[in-house]
Amino acid sequence: MKIDSGIVGRESAPERVEVDKRWIMAYNAALGAVSATPHPLYPVCYEWNATRALRQATGLQNLNAQLVHAQHDLNVHRAPQAGETLTTLARVVAAEQRRPGAFVTIRLAARGAGGDAVSTTDYGMLYRAVHLEGGNRSLEKLEDPPRHAGELSKVGEVPVAATAAHVYTECARIWNPIHTDPEYARDAGLPGIILHGTATLAFSISTLMGALRPKTLRRVQCRFSGMVLMPSTLTVHASRQGDAIAFETRDERGEPVIERGWIG
């Protein structure tokens, strides 16, 4: 299996999505909250159509079984509002060969009706055991999440129900069968269905907000470093470092499933 680095620079057609109150509340409900305020990670919901359209346009959709969400870097310019229509443009901004496979980064830029920036996400995807042809390419300077400078303390736990991935799929309107279909997941080489990386991240952010109550949240960065099987209990560990909060989320064995996490 292979990916041609010539896909760098390819864009999707602009995807228009209406943000509605029901969707906002459903996403919060998937995370165990009753609220009509958009969750900081809600952008993953309205970005999904653009992500899928770009994968289809570039042929990456044919490699979905090899895809692992590996890295996330979200900048929130302003909160989305219920009732508005957002336009999201997806663009492949980098491709590089890594030891486990081909690493592809797409940039998702969402704007309001007046053209104002709402959110920008660099979404890193690892295609396991896939070879990159044409050499590494990059159109943008991309930032890896920095390493943590100090010790992290446990700030909370996240109980993950056996049904968490199914509920998150429907409430977020994000569907990939590795999260809901055991047979598909096993055929993809996984031990079973796994929780979405964005769900793990959203649960972690909710825990951090409840425990440490940051005054602002304009940026989220992390690496996804392990699979979350269900049911399970995750622990979130964090500390304030400068103006940001550093965090790591660990599984029941104490192994990180999110590392180099930052919110600020």
Language model regions located:
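Small-side-chain structural scaffolding
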Residues: 28-30, 80, 101, 119-124, ...
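HotDog/MaoC-like acyl-thioester-processing domains
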Residues: 1-10, 69-157, 230-231, 235-264
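Hot-dog-fold acyl-thioester-processing enzymes
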Residues: 1-69, 132, 136-140, 145-214
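Catalytic-pocket segment enriched in acidic/His residues
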Residues: 179-257
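Small beta-barrel nucleic-acid-binding modules, principally OB-folds
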Residues: 64-78, 217, 225
